[in-house]
């Protein structure tokens, strides 16, 4: 968006920027409510209980107290927004219906505190959000109307797309999100890689790909947190994150609905790509809340190379067209 005379980008707040995106008022309101909820989540991260909650989520994973509290914060804000019909969270066992009617409303899938196990060692974590029009959450990620993540690191940053560019905001000392970078774009290829999962459980194609990156002199940059690792690849504009199929875990670890779809939507709108090794992540039709998939996400050429190695050098892997012109 163009700055008004006498206005710097650091004075453009999230609501003002969203209103310039040619989206409806309800979506502006919803995304601002999520941003407001994140302020309470970061307070919980900084001061909250680091112990276990004594419960398990849908996937049988022991929930931390911060997981439960962060989910409660996000869910309450979404319910009271008045513009949400269905909610799905990584911390809930089933879809929560807020309103029966879908007219003008949205469904939201989110991971309230991705990487929560890293908090006790003071590493960066984040919130990931996917938004669809209407009540159906089990649809291809390409149908998202918006996706966003909030990174709780040395700075708190928010990145979003509504299908027209990717934009970064940073929380200032008044806890307001102001524009930092507009229309973030990725290079065709990079020299950073962030490989998740135990390497001794990689299949032959993935192992060959890692050796290829090492021989090229690429830099390994992996924190164990999905949000900070994706943010690094995106903001540097180069590189790739991968969490492949593993021996014993053929679908990898990350969830399509809560993690892969929103991040793939953001990365593609920045000119990158995201694939499960066969098709674009955004073309997967999820059949359940807990569906998982391998992922290769980042610069388009890096993803193309990765999928070629995974498929034994074959080049017929389907790649989505870039959302970014030029």
Swiss-Prot record:
List of residues binding Mg(2+) 2: 111, 114, 259
EC number: 3.1.3.11
A cellular component annotation (GO) from this entry: cytosol
Domain of life: Bacteria
Cofactor note: Binds 2 magnesium ions per subunit.
Alphabetized UniProt keyword annotations: Carbohydrate metabolism, Cytoplasm, Hydrolase, Magnesium, Metal-binding
Pathway field: Carbohydrate biosynthesis; gluconeogenesis
The keyword Iron-sulfur appears for this protein: no
Binding site for substrate: 114-117, 222, 253
InterPro entries, per the entry: FBPase_C_dom (IPR044015), FBPase_class-1 (IPR000146), FBPase_N (IPR033391), FBPtase (IPR028343), Fructose_bisphosphatase_AS (IPR020548), SBPase (IPR023079)
Catalysed reactions, as listed in the record: beta-D-fructose 1,6-bisphosphate + H2O = beta-D-fructose 6-phosphate + phosphate
Residues the record lists as binding Mg(2+) 1: 90, 111, 113
Database matches in HAMAP family: FBPase_class1
Known partners and oligomeric status: Homotetramer.
Family of the protein in this entry: Belongs to the FBPase class 1 family.
Protein name per the record: Fructose-1,6-bisphosphatase class 1
Gene: fbp
């Amino acid at each position: 968006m163009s700055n008004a005379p006498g206005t710097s980008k650091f004075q453009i707040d999230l609501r003002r920027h969203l209103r310039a995106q040619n989206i409806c008022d309800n979506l502006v309101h919803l995304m601002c409510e999520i941003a407001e909820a994140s302020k309470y989540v970061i307070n919980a991260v900084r001061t909250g209980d680091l112990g276990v909650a004594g419960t398990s989520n849908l996937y049988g994973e022991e929930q931390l107290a911060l997981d439960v509290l962060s989910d409660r914060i996000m869910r309450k804000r979404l319910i009271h927004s008045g513009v949400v019909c269905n909610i799905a969270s990584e911390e809930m066992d089933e879809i929560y219906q807020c309103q029966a009617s879908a007219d003008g409303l949205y469904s939201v899938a989110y991971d309230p505190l991705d990487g929560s196990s890293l908090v006790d060692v003071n590493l960066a974590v984040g919130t990931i959000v996917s938004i669809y029009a209407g009540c159906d959450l089990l649809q291809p990620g390409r149908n998202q109307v918006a996706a966003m993540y909030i990174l709780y690191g040395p700075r708190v940053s928010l990145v979003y797309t509504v299908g027209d560019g990717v934009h970064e905001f940073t929380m200032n000392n008044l806890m307001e999100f102001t524009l930092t970078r507009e229309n973030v774009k990725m290079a065709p290829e990079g020299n950073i890689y962030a490989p998740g999962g135990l390497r001794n459980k990689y299949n032959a194609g993935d192992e060959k790909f890692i050796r290829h990156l090492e021989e090229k002199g690429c830099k390994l940059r992996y924190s164990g947190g999905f949000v900070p690792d994706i943010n690094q690849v995106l903001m540097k504009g180069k590189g790739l994150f991968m969490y492949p199929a593993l021996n014993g875990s053929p679908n990898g670890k990350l969830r399509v609905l809560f993690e892969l779809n929103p991040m793939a939507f953001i990365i593609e709108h920045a000119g990158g790509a995201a694939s499960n090794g066969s098709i674009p992540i955004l073309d997967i039709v999820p059949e359940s809340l807990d569906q998982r998939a391998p992922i290769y996400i980042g610069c388009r050429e890096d993803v193309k190379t990765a999928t070629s190695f995974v498929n034994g050098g074959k080049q017929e892997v389907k790649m989505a067209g870039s959302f970014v012109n030029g």
